[in-house]
């Protein structure tokens, strides 16, 4: 049986590992390195070069070299090279193909199966895109697991005592924080938070922007529009960032960076760690919000965390380590390699799936709440965020109007009460619902999140058995603003959301009251006086005028008036029902029946 390899498909670098002799082994690539740059170059003859070689020649071939494609996973972005357009999945597949080939050379056998990691805050469409990339690369992706969880898996394999662990994962393009409980082989994710658009690339870009601005100040030349010069700046910025993790100052030297009428120009600058910290201060601060959110969702204080694991190459930045240490009051664990631990964890999960690793149970969670849009534009959550996966939940809903022939299931992801404030994953229709009064048809909606975190939604008419289902694979990922809105604004807008929820509930109650009252009037015209009927109809009209407005107190007041106007009518109906029941009981007694206790009086209750 062939091995299941573990792959960390990173924004900047990727890594592959496999279980050997009960532990995870990092597989070196064909160049002898333990990580492979996630860089792809495609030549005009179709030849593909991946990794360090592609990265080295990016300066001379910037338009045919692609890096950091992971930031576009799950979107409709395409990169055009020599007239051909490539999706992020296709480019990522080329990196995966190299990792697969290197693993086969190391193991001496064909590799067909893999566990691939993704950021914990990846959306459903981004997870699906990652799985698709694996398929394109010729891999059967047995499981998609979250990067922080994989890191904890590698860290916690031998741990027997109970610990609360926080994984701080700052990679090349994404940031995740996960809080986990590790105890006797069980690794349970309690909460997760993050930002899909924050990582090492952003730190590089700050250096690039500074270099461009300083060079323009000195020479008047703008390097940002020169693709070849920009690629050299990018390489120099990444190198300077890495050097400043150990040095207090670094020199950036780029001879012949450009030229003008006076001749060639050279870029020579010094960058201190203090200046770098100043340039990137806002990026370090951007990690604080998700960290606090993850702790809050786990109902823990910073001092209750037993161990902090730093994952991702960007956690080597001194300012990041300093903030983590100051916030938690303890030094983070530096005993793990931040570039390799995720791939090692993925390999361990592969071992679990093969049965080679026993007594390890991984319980992961979904990062955002999932649900559907219901009457009044409300987001009705069916699966709350931080719910352990895999999970399957069903809920029965009904139609909003009489004789409704179809329902549209609008699938959403987020934390806000108003449907439009959340991220839309997709929608589908369930048609052919038999004509019936509102509230009568029973539509069962089922959400099923598999172990990969991929969402499957179905809707079934319980009356006819008709069913429609969809695997959500949306075409757009969450922007930084959308993520911040979902995680931070939910709390800031809590009162606003509560008021909106109450308003929608009042509108729905008003609709129900109008419908029920009109129906009862129609069915019992001889049981209401002309005066009462006029009062009831006037109250109905008044409620209809205000029910779709934004004034909840006006709706409540109009409902109360309608209820008061209907009281006498309702009393008359109940009196008649009771009289009929008594008459039936009396008739039974007169007949000498001994089954009078079994008689049931049926009546329609009108609120």
Swiss-Prot record:
Q: Does the keyword Cell membrane apply?
A: no
On this chain, the residues bearing Phosphothreonine are 174
Q: Which GO terms describe its biological process?
A: chaperone cofactor-dependent protein refolding; protein refolding
Q: Which InterPro entries match?
A: ATPase_NBD, Chaperone_DnaK, Heat_shock_70_CS, HSP70_C_sf, HSP70_peptide-bd_sf, Hsp_70_fam
The organism named in the record is Fusobacterium nucleatum subsp. nucleatum (strain ATCC 25586 / DSM 15643 / BCRC 10681 / CIP 101130 / JCM 8532 / KCTC 2640 / LMG 13131 / VPI 4355)
Q: What induces it?
A: By stress conditions e.g. heat shock.
Could you tell me the superkingdom of the organism this chain comes from?
Answer: Bacteria
Q: What does this protein do?
A: Acts as a chaperone.
Does this UniProt record's set of keywords contain Zinc?
A: no
Keywords on record: ATP-binding, Chaperone, Nucleotide-binding, Phosphoprotein, Stress response
Q: Where is the composition biased (Low complexity)?
A: 579-592
The name this protein carries in UniProt is Chaperone protein DnaK
According to the record, the residues making up region (Disordered) are: 579-607
Alphabetical list of PROSITE patterns matching this protein: HSP70_1, HSP70_2, HSP70_3
Family statement: Belongs to the heat shock protein 70 family.
Q: Which GO terms describe its molecular function?
A: ATP binding; ATP hydrolysis activity; ATP-dependent protein folding chaperone; heat shock protein binding; protein folding chaperone; unfolded protein binding
N-terminal signal peptide: none
Pfam families associated with the record: HSP70 (PF00012)
